[in-house]
Amino acid sequence: MSTYLQSSEGKFIPATKRPDGTWRKARRVKDGYVPQEEVPLYESKGKQFVAQRQAGVPPGMCPLLAAESKKEREKQERTRAKKQEKESGRQPKAPAPGVLVMPPSTCPPPKVSQQQQQQQQQPSGSRDINSISKTLEDTLKLDAAQEVVDPAKQLKKLRKKIREIEQIESRIQAGEQKKLDKDQLDKVKKKSEILRQIKDLESTPRS
């Protein structure tokens, strides 16, 4: 767009520099003059008709009204599409032809005992400690009706129990098990009692 200079004599186009370095003189502009680059290009009726159709505006219709009508039409289409999606989501999908649909199984899953679940959940180190503890518990059970055993054999059994308790303690110190449950703690606490029994048997004179 041309820039004009205003003076007491009227409007002027300022001097401009040519590519070769020379200057064009300032030119006076008459009233009502429109520069060539600002003159709108002529478009025939047919060209205007094609341009309006490409823009989505019906021939002879105001562009603003056409834009509003287009927005309203797009809004209605979106609303209709959302409604169809909701209705299709409520209806169950039909199985493909030739596909046999089996009803959900009513058979209960196989039962797993609580002991088996605990063994599966426990790490190998914990299972080893529990196994040793179980063996120790069985050996610590004394039968009241049992006859008096040989002190040498009894001493041998008590020493075996001490070795089993020490195995549990070594596993705890090695970090294979962070803490013991109540039963395991009770078994470890019996170490002093077993040591006392061993001491008594060792001090008892043998016949």
Curated annotation (Swiss-Prot):
Keywords: Coiled coil, Cytoplasm, Nucleus. InterPro entries: PYM1, WIBG_mago-bd, WIBG_N_sf. GO terms for cellular component: cytoplasm; exon-exon junction complex. Residues 1-28, 52-133 are annotated as: Disordered. Residues 64-91, 152-184 form a coiled coil. Disruption phenotype: Viable and fertile. No visible phenotype. SUPFAM superfamilies: Pym (Within the bgcn gene intron protein, WIBG), N-terminal domain. Disulfide bonds: none annotated. One of its GO terms (molecular function) is RNA binding. GO terms for biological process: exon-exon junction complex disassembly; nuclear-transcribed mRNA catabolic process, nonsense-mediated decay. Residues 123-133 have a biased composition (Polar residues). It is found in: Cytoplasm; Nucleus. Expression detected in the ovary. In the oocyte expressed in the germarium, nurse cell and follicle cell. Residues 68-90 have a biased composition (Basic and acidic residues). Interacts (via N-terminus) with mago and tsu/RBM8A; the interaction is direct. Belongs to the pym family. This is Partner of Y14 and mago. It comes from Drosophila melanogaster.
